[in-house]
Amino acid sequence: MPVTATSWLRPMRGGSQTHLIKASDGHHYVVKLSNNPQGIRTLVNEWIAQRILSYLKIPCPEIEIVDIPQSLIDATPKLGILRGQVMQAPPSGWHFGSRFPGDPAVLTVHDVLPDIQLVTCRNIHHFAAVLTFDKWLANADSRQSVFYRARLLDVLANEEKFPDPEYAMRGLVASMIDHGYCFNGVYWDFPDAPAYGLYYRAEVYRRIRGWADFEPWLERIQSFPESVLDKALHEIPRAWLEPSEQEELTNLLDRLLARRSKVPSLLEATKDRFPNHFPNWR
């Protein structure tokens, strides 16, 4: 069941004009509105992408459908989409929510870090992991992430490579966000390009020395179960889809499964086009 928006905190940065909202479950969400300038299909893309990332065990925020009541919209003039000089209010109803990783009054979240801090990120290897995902889903955006300090157990509990004794420690971690441009955004196709999904800071890829550094995620993609996509498809609110789009989306996911074997060649094309990002990959 959706959570209900109870209070608005502030607008967030970015082209989709998201808003930070507190919900009835006590959590805060970065909410992408259904009337956002990038199109309602980006909500569908976000939902499917998170379900795939979760199965692949790549850190990303929890998601919920956020029900925004008309009473909150009426009481909050800044809750909406700015088009030119006009603020366009969202429709009441169901929107996409990406859970903020803590209390925004206490937790500092960064979307950019200097290299001296970036190299201390405890799960920097997940940038190799998420690159496999971005290639598979034809993420036509650059890789977006946020960084914050957290108990490592809470973020890396499913991480096979992480040493157990350090689980109780706190450290700087990365969480992968902003997947509206997967499937080439509203176009729902797969126009592959070497730059797609690449993080703009080469430092996150310097530890990559070969194909082993993309495991176990490449293997998880190759054996990805259709049932995960079926479940995600049935979770998507019908209000986010036109009747004619249901079949189109089903066909898109069929094509996604059919291109799993293409991911290694897409990674190699990226390495060849941007060798400075992968100086140690031989």
Enumerate the predicted regions with their spans.
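Phosphate/dinucleotide-binding and metal-coordinating scaffold of catalytic cores
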Residues: 1-282
